Amino acid sequence: IKYFNKNKSSRLPLVKIEDSPRFSYRGFMLDISRHFYPKDKIIEVLDILSLLKLNYFELRLTDDEGWRIEIPGLPELTTVGANRGYTVNERDKLIPAYGSGAHGTKNGNGYLSKKDFKEILVYANNLGIKVIP
């Protein structure tokens, strides 16, 4: 139907659509601990989940491969845990993993601020999607 809205010359026949989900739990998991995606990409994912009528979104924020959420009072979690590159002792960043490269490129680096995470939660809730961090 979205396609037809963009194409003004298209018409739909008069129909009645009855639709209901077969399963009560319809979910998707995005693991940003292993490969970071910024807030705008997560919002795009939520829009797609809404179109597909999924109602649960597991957002993996932490694991051995990365820490992706700001925690006030513990800045070292993001200053070290949200960055990858060559390191001897992992005091300033984590070892390269999952395509991030050994030279400290920005690929795979980053974290969600407290504000970003709240905006994601509100946006998902408005779409009827429950976020499981």
Regions found by a protein language model. Give the residues of each.
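Feature activates predominantly on carbohydrate-active enzymes
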Residues: 1-133
